[in-house]
């Protein structure tokens, strides 16, 4: 019968805490069972969420320039356009006056589409990758509807034989 190791020394306790270099546990087993596409999908989801958190932090905490421009725009009274105004200034004024829900839709729909695509890459079945993207989803739904109509037309053409 093998003798249990004595972890009284520092290096042995470090080996106990860190391990022998091989990971074990349910997370490691789940990672080993995934194929390459699924692993890259999970890494992509993690990096996408990390980049999203950094972008949200930048927009809402660090970017003083946008806050200053938005406050200046709110404090201004509507004036007649000046003769020296360029098209970029007028475009910026029009974009800053858009309501919050428009900006939310403009940024949230592509953001969610990209997230759902990366999340679909984590699925085990490669045929289901990308079904959550709106154009692909609409194409699949229309294709299924056309197949259903075609099948129902073929069934209605069959004659019942009374015996």
UniProtKB/Swiss-Prot annotation:
Record organism: Homo sapiens
Disease listed for this protein: Dysostosis multiplex, Ain-Naz type: An autosomal recessive, severe skeletal disease characterized by features of dysostosis multiplex, severe short stature, coarse facies with broad nose and prominent lips, protruding abdomens, and progressive skeletal changes causing gradual mobility loss. Death in childhood or early adulthood may occur.
Please give the InterPro entries that the UniProt record associates with this protein: LYSET (IPR028024)
| UniProt-annotated location(s) | Golgi apparatus membrane
GO-annotated cellular components: Golgi apparatus; Golgi cisterna; Golgi membrane
Chief subcellular location equals Golgi
Q: Which GO terms describe its biological process?
A: lysosomal transport; lysosome organization; regulation of vesicle-mediated transport
The gene from which this protein is expressed is LYSET
Record function comment: Required for mannose-6-phosphate-dependent trafficking of lysosomal enzymes. LYSET bridges GlcNAc-1-phosphate transferase (GNPTAB), to the membrane-bound transcription factor site-1 protease (MBTPS1), thus allowing proteolytic activation of the GNPTAB. GNPTAB is involved in the regulation of M6P-dependent Golgi-to-lysosome trafficking of lysosomal enzymes. LYSET is thus an essential factor for maturation and delivery of lysosomal hydrolases. (Microbial infection) Essential for infection by muliple viruses, including SARS-CoV-2, that utilize activated cathepsins for entry after M6P-dependent lysosomal transport.
Tell me the first and last residues of the signal peptide: none
Subunit structure, as described in the record: Interacts with GNPTAB; this interaction is important for proper localization of GNPTAB in Golgi stacks. Interacts with MBTPS1.
UniProt KW keywords: Disease variant, Dwarfism, Golgi apparatus, Host-virus interaction, Membrane, Transmembrane, Transmembrane helix
Q: What is this protein called?
A: Lysosomal enzyme trafficking factor
Membrane topology note: Multi-pass membrane protein
Q: Which PANTHER family match?
A: LYSOSOMAL ENZYME TRAFFICKING FACTOR (PTHR31925:SF1), TRANSMEMBRANE PROTEIN 251 (PTHR31925)
A Pfam family the protein falls into: TMEM251
Its family remark reads: Belongs to the LYSET family.
Q: Membrane-spanning regions, if any? A: 40-60, 98-118
